[in-house]
């Protein structure tokens, strides 16, 4: 676990840069995510990931002759607090904003940044979203200034349900999700896609619970047991996943789990406690055990430096593509960066090609369905020192993950 005092020290100073970066004439990236409160476990790992990437890029000379500098801001997973923090970031000279945890936060930031850009021509900002996956952000609420590197929740559910439709042992499914825009999107997509692909499956429960406020999931697990479900689908993340699985372990609940974020901090430990060996599945853009030499070497270096696994291959794609776009544009102007990112094709962290769709600024990339359990000789990494690690069950090429968009974007004139 990353020291909270370590993070707090850098938040207090407002700077977390590559080791050789200096404050003046750097490419400032404001990292706005939870560094305190219930979401801090994932926010801290995200911050270290961006620190690692700043160091990596700066060691290669940065971009357009400038070094990268990470400015951390604690939003406490709160949309209103995020708007306070983004204004602070702008005041400190940041014109590149990144955030990932919480689609309600993402929606607030995207709207604020779009309006800021309208009011401040020539001083525009760009928002790089590495993990907030409500589909609306690249559909009805798309903006030119917003780019997303994680697959949206509909893309992920499409992949999961395509796999699930072939699993004939699935008869009864229980949905449990966080009660905000993302969780609501997960339940909607799961219900509609299961009905279309496996109409014989019964949805025996559909539960929403408060975001990052539940400390004991035992009552929810009791409902799942009583329903007779053989399978649970959840988009829960951070402590809402870890505590949910801990309660499942305590109750001896023996079901299959189809998840988005089983790999988040605390998740693998809770999964191991359930004893559900390769019965907890996740849809991800990669994993430590993908057979790819370059990413496994980076994984090893990341773990040696921080003592945690790399949960954000998408952040690697984002930062490396940002550097490529800056070099292509030969400019750090956000509008020019955005134009350079559009339709960019890129070799992704775990191998294979991804592309940034111009129509809506959604990044498409190879996706993996993985399960957590005992590791074999071709799976070198475990998770959270549990002895369990990821195994690839299915891989989808980027072209096979594409869904249509309703985005009607106002573009720079």
Where are the predicted features?
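Sec/Tat signal peptide C-region and signal peptidase I cleavage site
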Residues: 18-23
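Extracytoplasmic "Venus flytrap"
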Residues: 30-51, 73-80, 101-102, 176-185, ...
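Beta-alpha junction/loop-to-helix N-cap segments that form part of ligand/metal-binding clefts
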Residues: 26, 41-48, 60-137, 149, ...
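Solvent-exposed, acidic/polar segments of extracytosolic/periplasmic ligand-binding ectodomains
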Residues: 27, 346-413
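Bacterial N-terminal signal peptides
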Residues: 8-17
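Periplasmic-binding protein-like
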Residues: 89-103, 120-130, 172-177, 228-238, ...
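Extracellular/periplasmic Venus flytrap/periplasmic-binding protein
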Residues: 80-84, 135-136, 144-252, 288-297
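Extracellular/periplasmic periplasmic-binding protein-like sensory domains
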Residues: 143, 245-319, 327-332, 376, ...
């Amino acid at each position: 676990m990353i020291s909270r005092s370590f993070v707090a020290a850098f938040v207090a100073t407002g700077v977390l840069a590559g080791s050789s970066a200096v404050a003046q004439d750097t490419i400032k990236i404001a990292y706005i995510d939870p560094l305190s409160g219930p979401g801090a476990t994932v926010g801290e790992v995200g911050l270290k990931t961006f620190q690692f990437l700043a160091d990596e890029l700066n060691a290669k000379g940065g971009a357009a002759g400038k070094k990268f500098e990470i400015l951390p801001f604690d939003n406490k997973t709160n949309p209103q607090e995020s708007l306070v923090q983004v204004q602070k970031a702008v005041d400190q000279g940041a014109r590149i904003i990144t955030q990932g945890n919480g689609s309600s936060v993402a929606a607030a930031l995207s709207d604020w940044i779009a309006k800021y850009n309208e009011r401040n021509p020539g001083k525009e900002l760009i928002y790089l979203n590495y993990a907030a996956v409500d589909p609306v952000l690249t559909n009805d609420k798309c903006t030119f200034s917003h780019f997303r590197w994680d697959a949206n929740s509909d893309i992920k559910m499409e992949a999961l349900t395509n796999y699930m439709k072939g699993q004939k042992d699935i008869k009864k499914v229980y949905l449990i999700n966080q009660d905000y825009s993302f969780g609501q999107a997960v339940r909607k997509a799961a219900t509609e896609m299961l009905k279309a692909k496996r109409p014989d499956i019964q949805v025996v429960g559909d539960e929403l619970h408060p975001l990052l406020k539940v400390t004991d999931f035992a009552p929810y697990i009791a409902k799942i047991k009583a329903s007779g479900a053989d399978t649970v689908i959840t988009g829960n993340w951070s402590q809402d996943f870890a505590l949910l699985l801990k309660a499942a372990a305590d109750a001896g609940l023996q079901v299959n789990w189809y998840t988005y974020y089983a790999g988040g901090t605390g998740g693998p430990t809770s999964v191991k406690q359930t004893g559900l060996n390769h019965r907890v599945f996740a849809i991800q853009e990669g994993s430590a055990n993908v057979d790819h030499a370059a990413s496994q070497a980076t994984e090893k270096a990341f773990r040696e430096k921080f003592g945690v696994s790399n949960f954000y291959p998408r952040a690697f794609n984002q930062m490396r593509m940002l550097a490529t776009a800056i070099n292509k544009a030969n400019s750090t102007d956000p509008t020019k960066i955005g134009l350079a990112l559009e339709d960019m094709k890129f070799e992704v962290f775990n191998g294979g090609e991804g592309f940034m769709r111009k129509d809506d600024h959604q990044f498409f990339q190879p996706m993996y369905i993985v399960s957590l359990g005992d590791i074999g000789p071709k799976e070198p990494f475990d998770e959270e020192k549990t002895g369990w690690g990821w195994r690839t069950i299915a891989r989808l090429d980027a072209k096979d993950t594409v869904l249509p968009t309703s985005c009607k974007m106002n573009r720079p004139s």
